[in-house]
Regions:
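N-terminal Rossmann-like NAD(P)+-binding domain of SDR-like oxidoreductases, especially those catalyzing
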Residues: 1-184
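Short, flexible active-site loop motifs that bind/organize anionic cofactors or intermediates
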Residues: 7, 31, 55, 80, ...
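Secondary-structure transition/hinge residues
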Residues: 73, 116, 165, 169, ...
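Short-chain dehydrogenase/reductase
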Residues: 98, 147-155, 191-199, 203, ...
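A general boundary/transition motif marking the beginning of the first structured unit of a protein
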Residues: 113, 192-197, 295, 314
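Short, basic/glycine-rich phosphate-binding loops at helix/coil junctions
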Residues: 183-185, 222-223
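Hydrophobic, Gly/Ser/Ala-rich alpha-helical and linker tracts in large acyl-processing enzymes
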Residues: 185-198, 205-208, 214
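C-terminal substrate-binding subdomain of Rossmann-fold SDR/epimerase-dehydratase oxidoreductases
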Residues: 201-341
Length: 341
């Protein structure tokens, strides 16, 4: 049987493909290269030493999704990464975000049921918790109160999947709530390659370290945290990818609906990350303190005990390795995958 990885050429998707192939799974990758490129998948093949099926397709096109399932009748599980993902852009383009992100999953669900595929793992996010009343965050914390349309698309999609799961006793759903994925494959062959100005902290720091950007902008140093900067639960992307392999095994037990945080359970501040990256690259990272960004919260990290208990999974990498692997990727690929073109 095979696993459909929608959005499999993206940052998390490509690393997950590597781990799936290493675990012996057959995969079908679908991507429209909206925020990714073919070179990422060429490098996945190089790392894994294995080939796989690929379809260039947009998940918002139901006919295209239907064709994938019709031509690959052995698909029995979907890992759904396909979505727009820039928080800031979602605020200025809410219609595009709601249309795209909801349609991708709705189309997949509709086609799945016609092809007797009963397992789906959804790429959700800690953003569904909004501004939590306390930390660490457990899976039974309230969902909602999101501060941007991107986060709200995750809440809505979780609700859709939950309703479908309740309506169909054969459907098994894993909602994986990621915290802050960073890092790159230890080989340095694949990593995060954002189009344009990076939206996330570590790719931005990496661009500063490699000389592509002047300095890091730290948004606020007056939060109620040890050094005044925002605290987040950063997780190595390879650990996150391994969590998806564990989730497949969980779905094989036919749990119905399964919800799980994927994080380390440790919070690191913005300045902690800057200092760790500085050590990794052997350079001082210049930064400037800017005003807080609207919608940012002071601290966010998870209680990962459910993942350990029910998936047999826990994060292996610490912040030092996350930064070292990011630097290894960035220093060898200063222009991302364009370096290879």
């Amino acid at each position: 049987m095979a696993i459909l990885v929608s959005g499999g050429a993206g940052y998390i998707g490509s690393h997950t493909c590597v781990e799936l192939l290493a675990a012996g799974y057959d995969i079908v990758v679908a991507d429209n290269y909206y925020n990714s490129c073919p070179e990422a998948l060429a490098r996945v093949k190089k790392i894994a030493g294995k080939d796989f099926r690929f379809v260039e397709a947009d998940m918002t096109d139901k006919d295209a999704v239907e064709k994938i399932f019709a031509e690959n009748e052995d698909i029995d599980c979907v890992i759904q990464f396909a979505a727009y993902k820039a928080v800031g852009e979602s605020v200025s383009k809410p219609i595009e975000y709601y249309s795209n992100n909801l349609a991708c999953t709705l189309n997949i669900l509709d086609v799945m049921r016609r092809h007797n595929c009963h397992n789906i793992i959804f790429s959700s996010s800690a953003t569904v918790y909004g501004d939590p009343a306390s930390v660490p965050i457990r899976e039974d914390f309230p969902v909602g109160g999101t501060t941007n349309p991107y986060g709200t698309t995750k809440v809505f999609t979780e609700r859709i999947l939950t309703d479908c799961c309740h309506a169909d006793p054969e459907l098994n759903v894993a909602l994986l709530r990621y915290f802050n994925p960073i890092g790159a494959h230890p080989s340095g062959l694949i990593g995060e390659a954002p189009n344009g100005l990076p939206n996330n902290l570590v790719p931005y720091i990496a661009k500063v370290a490699v000389g592509k950007l002047e300095k890091v902008h730290v948004f606020g140093n007056d939060y109620p945290t040890p050094d005044g900067t925002g605290v987040r639960d950063y997780i190595h992307v390879v650990d996150l990818a391994r969590g998806h392999v564990a989730a497949i095994k969980k779905l094989e037990q036919k749990p119905g609906l399964f919800i799980c945080n994927l994080g380390t359970g440790h919070g690191y501040s913005v300045l902690d990350v800057i200092n760790a990256f500085s050590k990794a690259c052997g350079k001082e990272i210049p930064y400037v303190i800017d005003p807080r960004r609207p919608g940012d919260i002071a601290e966010c990290w998870c209680d990962p005990s459910k993942a350990k208990r029910e998936l047999g999974w826990e994060a292996q990498y610490g912040i030092e390795e996350m930064c070292a692997h990011s630097w290894n990727w960035q220093s060898h690929n200063p222009d991302g995958y364009k370096t290879a073109e």
